[in-house]
Curated annotation (Swiss-Prot):
Binding site for mRNA: 24, 49, 118-122, 129-133, 139-140
Annotated InterPro entries: NCBP2 (IPR027157), NCBP2_RRM (IPR034148), Nucleotide-bd_a/b_plait_sf (IPR012677), RBD_domain_sf (IPR035979), RRM_dom (IPR000504)
Domain RRM residue range list: 46-124
Database matches in SUPFAM superfamilies: RNA-binding domain, RBD
SMART domains: RRM (SM00360)
Originating species: Eremothecium gossypii (strain ATCC 10895 / CBS 109.51 / FGSC 9923 / NRRL Y-1056) (Yeast)
Function: Component of the cap-binding complex (CBC) involved in the nuclear export of capped U snRNAs. The CBC complex is required for efficient pre-mRNA splicing through efficient commitment complex and spliceosome formation; and involved in rRNA processing at sites A0, A1 and A2.
Keywords: mRNA processing, mRNA splicing, mRNA transport, Nucleus, Ribosome biogenesis, RNA-binding, rRNA processing, Transport
GO cellular component: nuclear cap binding complex; nucleus
PROSITE patterns for this protein: RRM
Protein name listed in UniProt: Nuclear cap-binding protein subunit 2
Length: 218
């Protein structure tokens, strides 16, 4: 699939334009059937996607900030699909596409609740997209996050579910390969062609491994 019209756009400028689709949208368009048409729709849509929000940012705060770029018809908060609590993103629907582009140009990377928010074009909101798609109900990006983030739920996935014995992430320790494998040959008579089981050699590659169950902070 060719996205030349979005990669090039025949714009000769000394700096990058701000009213263009993100690399994420272009990658998605290449991988998804009908993605190019969806990308074109996002250029004329009055809807924007806002990400990297604090879980504690309110709809009123969003309205106050984004209404500086135009008349807002609706704000749809992103929710954890199990808890129905905010999970760090939203959709904002303006009255015109020009207002949506203005928000993209002038409000991207604005700091809101001490977080640098991200804004992207959106082809249009559909019911169901307000819910997180992660395994635990929130956003996938939070489930991949390793560091503590107080404004986005702390350690979103419990530490013990990501490291230590659960995911076999800790260091491995090999048991003593000679422990409990001493062979006593005194007093035993071996018949020719029938080696005794106790005389079998220990294969170091088959030695049982002991997982290091140490988890930081515990």
């Amino acid at each position: 699939m060719s996205l030349a019209e979005f990669d090039e756009l025949r714009w000769d400028h000394s700096c990058d334009r701000l009213d263009v689709p993100s690399n994420y949208l272009k990658r998605k368009a290449r991988k998804t059937p009908g993605g190019l048409e969806e990308l074109r729709k996002s250029m004329t849509s009055a809807t924007i996607y806002v990400g990297n929000l604090s879980f504690y940012t309110s709809e009123e705060q969003l309205y106050e900030l984004f209404s500086k770029c135009g008349s807002i018809e609706k704000i749809i908060m992103g929710l954890d699909r199990f808890k129905f609590t905010p999970c760090g993103f939203c959709f904002i629907i303006y009255q015109t596409p020009q207002e949506a582009l203005a928000a993209l140009k002038y409000l991207s990377k604005t700091k809101l609740d001490d977080r640098e928010i991200t804004i992207d074009l959106d082809p249009g909101f559909e019911e169901g997209r307000q819910f997180g798609r992660g395994k635990n109900g929130g956003q996938v990006s939070d489930e991949l996050r390793f560091e503590f983030d107080a404004s986005r739920g702390g350690f979103y996935v419990p530490l013990e579910n990501r490291i230590g014995a659960v995911n076999h992430f800790g260091a491995r320790r090999i048991r003593d390969p000679h422990k409990n494998h001493h062979h006593h040959h005194h007093g035993h008579h071996h018949h020719h062609g029938q080696p005794h089981a106790a005389a079998a050699k220990v294969n170091p590659m088959e030695v049982e491994e002991e997982l290091d169950s140490y988890i930081p902070g515990q």
